[in-house]
Amino acid sequence: MDFKDTPEEAAYRAQVRDWLTANAPKHGFPLDTSKPDYMPRAKVWQAEKAAAGYACITWPKDWGGQGGTPVQNVIYAEEEGPYQTPSALFSIGLGMCLPTVMTVADEATKTRFVGPAMRGEEIWCQLFSEPSGGSDVAAVRTRAVRSDDGSGDWIINGQKVWTTGAQFSDYGIIITRTDPDVPKHKGMTMFWVDMRDPGVEVRPIHQMSGGSKFNEVFITDVRVKDSQRLGAVGDGWKVSLVTLMNERLSVSGVRPPGWPAFLDAARATPEAMQDRALREKLADWYVQAEGLRHTRNRTMTALSKGETPGPESSIGKIVLTDYLHDLSSEAVDMLDQYGIIDDPALSPANAAPQAMWVGNPGLRLAGGTDEILRNIIAERVLGLPGDIRVDKDVAFKDMPRGR
C-alpha cells in the first residue's frame, strides 16, 4: 500500500488545490441542504466546477468529464473536503444515478440527461428503499405493470421512503417489481421517472436535527414509456448493483467531518486542554481518524491498480458513525449551556455540533445499517458462513409478509 502521490498525482493535487483556494470558502461543518439558500448556491457551485472540469472527473471527455482516473477523483474529494462547498445536492445524481444511466441507457437518453446533470441544471434522486423492505433492497413491492392500451407504456404504483433530496429532484431512478411470480431478485426492473409528474407526491420527513433531507415518495398511476426502462425487463437487480457499486466508488475525503474544527476549538480553549480526560479522547479520535485515512489509502491503492475496492470499506462506515457520535457529543458538552443552540443564524459555530449530534443516528441507517455492514464484513472479509435464506427459490408473491 503506497501512501504517497506519484509525481503526476502530486501535480494534479497542486492544480486542484490552487483552484479551490481561489474559488471555495473555508469551513468546519457541512451546510444544511434543507435551507432555502442551499439550492441556488449549490447550482452556482456545480456550474463552476463543471466549467473548470472538476464536476465529473472520471467521466469520459465525450460526456463532459476529464477522462480522469479514480485516484484523481479521490484527490479532488480530499482537497475539497476542508472547504464549504454545497455539493451534496448532486452527489446521488452524479455519483450513482447518472453513472447507471451512462452504463445501461440508450444514446438518446444519455445525450438528453448527462450534460444538464453534470452542470447542475437538473437534480436526480434514487428511489430504492421502501417502508416494508427495511435494508433488503430486493424486497420491492412498488409495481410496474404494462398498460393494456397497446402503447407499451408502464404504469407504476407504490411507495418509497428515505429518498434523499427528492423534494429538490427533477428526475429519479426507480426500482420496481414487474414479475411477482419469480424469486424476488429476478422480477425487478428499473426505470427513470419525472419527479414532477402529477402522480408523484413527495413528503419531506422532518428530522430531529430540524432539517428534512429525507422524504417519503408516493407513486400513483405514473405512466412511463418503455424507452424510460434502464436495462432489460427483469434485470433490475443487476442494474441496481451497478448503482450500488458506484455508490461505493463515490469516495469522500479522508478527514471525517468536524475533526479539524473540533481540534481547533479545543486548542483555542486552554482550560479544555488542561482536562486529561479530554486529551485522552483526542488521542483516541486521532487514532480513529488515522485508521479511516489508511482505510481510504487502501481504497486508493486498489483504484490505482484498476481494481474495485473490496468489502473492507464497510469497516470505515461503522467506525465513522461511532466516531462522529463521540466527537459531536463531546463538542456539545464542551459548549455547556450554549450546546442547546440549534439555529445557525444565532451562532453557526455553536449550532453545528448539535446538528451533527442529533443527525448522527440517521447515519447508522443510511447507506447500509450497522447490522448489514457487520454481516458483509463477517461473510466477505472474515469468510464466516452467511445467514440462512429460506426465500431463495420462492416466488415473491408467495413470500410471507406482515399485514
Residue ranges and their predicted role:
Residues 1-91, 112, 116, 251-252, ...:
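Amphipathic, small/basic residue-rich leader segments at the start of a protein or domain
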Residues 22, 50, 66, 247, ...:
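Alpha-helix capping/hinge segments and adjacent helical runs
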Residues 50-121, 165-171, 247, 289, ...:
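Internal helix-loop-helix
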Residues 120-128:
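A short, Trp-centered hydrophobic/proline-enriched beta-strand micro-motif
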Residues 141, 152-203:
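A short core secondary-structure module
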Residues 142-146:
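A structural signal for short hydrophobic beta-strand segments in well-ordered beta-sheet cores
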Residues 200-295, 363, 399-403:
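Glycine-rich beta->alpha junctions and the first turn(s) of the following alpha-helix
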Residues 279-283, 311-318:
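Short, charged, amphipathic alpha-helical segments
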